[in-house]
UniProtKB/Swiss-Prot annotation:
The lineage of its organism: Bacteria, Pseudomonadati, Pseudomonadota, Gammaproteobacteria, Enterobacterales. The modification N6-(pyridoxal phosphate)lysine is found at K217. Homodimer. This is Histidinol-phosphate aminotransferase. It catalyses: L-histidinol phosphate + 2-oxoglutarate = 3-(imidazol-4-yl)-2-oxopropyl phosphate + L-glutamate. It comes from Salmonella typhi.
């Protein structure tokens, strides 16, 4: 066979995968910093001791202790909980279970979390965007106009990267608009920082509501890769058909169960209180910093701010080993950087570096 007729391995791949721009995670973007404030992680490590040593056996598909502990914590039934490799896997499972590639669409409202788009594109499902309003709330009319053929609507509340909660009345309206037509996924990755805003209590009324949760943020376990999907039992049973047979390793399940014990949850809540206190310190300091044009309200463990010269500020801090998250490419976020709330020492380094910037 001539070399002219030989396909490269890349040519054998699906066209949408060849054209795919992968999600630019904080770790993928790299950097050589010692102050990492770009991934909304908790700034200090937590310690656990493994209690399960049966690594010669496959783990449970849905570890009973993890499911029961999370159900009790979230105020739902165990049958309404699915555990997965981070909330990102939950995003993918919902799309795989409900969307026909080449036929159905997902819908989301930028600026928002990038994995909704990447997961849909990977699977070959159409992506529709309805940009958020100027105040970053939902454009309900725009969503209504684009619902035909959309099987899944993603809403992040509090929203990443903007930090604000979505108006609960708008969420109710969205759930009524989509009843019998589409699944609504409420991404609550940051809900521990504003627990009063959870939609978990709405599952009784809305059979098409799905809620995503994670241990990566307030539980300080980003390295564990453990997330949860809350939904009615009918939805959970569908997702169980498409999830991998052993999504959680034994060590992950072991640590997750410990983190979700009453003691673990109390420690998490103390951590949240500490983070909220540091967030206010950082907000106050940013508001008194010359190169900062505006600091947006936040209900999370990060702050979005608009700068007079964000690109040069980002690079200057990067060169000093302070790694922030550039949001300039997100719709309506020109001039914006996202700053994870760190320790007091890290937050002070950010402020000192910003105040040294030319205006």
């Amino acid at each position: 066979m001539s070399t002219e007729n030989t396909l490269s391995v890349a040519d054998l791949a699906r066209e949408n995968v060849r054209n795919l721009v992968p999600y630019q995670s904080a770790r993928r973007l790299g950097g050589n910093g010692d102050v990492w404030l770009n991934a909304n992680e908790f700034p200090t490590a937590v310690e656990f001791q493994l209690t399960q040593q049966t690594l010669n056996r496959y783990p449970e598909c849905q570890p009973k202790a993890v499911i029961e502990n999370y159900a009790q914590y979230a105020g739902v039934k165990p049958e309404q909980v699915l555990v997965s490799r981070g909330a990102d896997e939950g995003i993918e499972l919902v799309i795989r279970a409900f969307c026909e590639p080449g036929k159905d669409a997902i819908l989301y409202c930028p600026p928002t979390y990038g994995m909704y788009s990447v997961s849909a594109e990977t699977i070959g499902v159409e992506r529709r965007t309805v940009p958020a309003l100027e105040n970053w709330q939902l454009d309900l009319q725009g969503i209504s106009d684009n619902l035909d053929g959309a099987k899944v609507v993603f809403v992040c509340s509090p929203n990443n990267p903007t930090g604000q909660l979505i108006n609960p009345q708008d969420l109710r309206t969205l759930l009524e608009l989509t009843r019998g037509k589409a699944i609504v996924v409420a991404d609550e990755a940051y809900i521990e920082f504003c627990p009063q805003a959870t939609l978990a209590g709405w599952l009784v009324k809305y059979p098409h509501l799905v809620i995503l949760r994670t241990l990566s943020k307030a539980f300080a376990l980003a390295g564990l890769r453990c997330g949860f999907t809350l939904a009615n039992e009918e939805v959970i049973n569908l997702l169980l058909k498409v999830i991998a047979p052993y999504p959680l390793s034994t060590p992950v399940a072991d640590i997750a169960a410990q983190a979700l014990s009453p003691q673990g949850i109390n420690v998490m809540r103390d951590r949240v209180a500490q983070t909220v206190q540091e967030r206010q310190y950082l907000v106050n300091a940013l508001q008194q910093t010359a190169c900062v044009e505006h600091v947006f309200d936040s209900e999370t463990n990060y702050i979005l701010a608009r700068f007079t010269a964000s690109s040069s500020v980002f690079k200057s801090l990067w060169d000093q080993g302070i790694i922030l998250r550039d949001q300039n490419k997100q719709p309506s976020l020109s001039g914006c950087l996202r700053i994870t709330v760190g320790t007091r020492q890290e937050n002070q380094r950010v402020i000192d570096a910003l105040r040294a910037e030319p205006v």
